[in-house]
């Protein structure tokens, strides 16, 4: 439960909605197929995170809060032949404050975390700029 609590703090977002994803196929090197739903009544809870960590239900966090502010953002890279080591080296070379994770389908998620909340539009602009710079 401790990990679920920590993830709930790190990936805090909307308190009004979250997403779920039920996997129908999970073939590495292909976009994972499944059913995505947006639950418009409540943000993600520790229970949602626990189910996600146990593989019971995929979880999608909406990073934008009710004031249109974010504390984190992500770039989703659906290139399955992506060399993660090269990507990480490029990020380190440019001293970018990013964290790279392999996605379940074999692509990557590149996360940017902030110390203070910022306007969502500013985060989106910066992530687009970074994505273009990384190629």
How would you describe each model-predicted region?
Residues 1-72, 81-87:
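DNA replication initiation on ssDNA origins
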Residues 59-61, 95-101:
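A short linear hydrophobic-aromatic micro-motif
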Residues 75, 98-126:
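Histidine-centered divalent-metal-coordination microenvironment in nucleic-acid enzymes
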Residues 78:
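Anionic group-transfer/hydrolysis microenvironments
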């Amino acid at each position: 439960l401790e990990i679920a609590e920590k993830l709930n703090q790190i990936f805090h977002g909307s308190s009004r909605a979250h997403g779920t994803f039920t996997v129908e196929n999970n073939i590495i090197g292909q976009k994972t197929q499944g059913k995505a739903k947006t639950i418009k009544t409540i943000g993600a809870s520790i229970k949602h995170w626990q189910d996600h960590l146990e593989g019971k239900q995929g979880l999608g966090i909406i990073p934008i809060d009710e004031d249109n502010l974010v504390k984190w953002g992500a770039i989703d890279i659906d290139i399955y032949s992506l060399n993660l080591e090269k990507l990480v080296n490029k990020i380190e070379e440019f001293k970018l404050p990013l964290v790279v994770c392999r996605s379940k389908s074999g692509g990557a998620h590149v996360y940017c975390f902030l110390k203070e909340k910022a306007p969502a539009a500013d985060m989106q602009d910066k992530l687009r700029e970074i994505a273009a710079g990384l190629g």
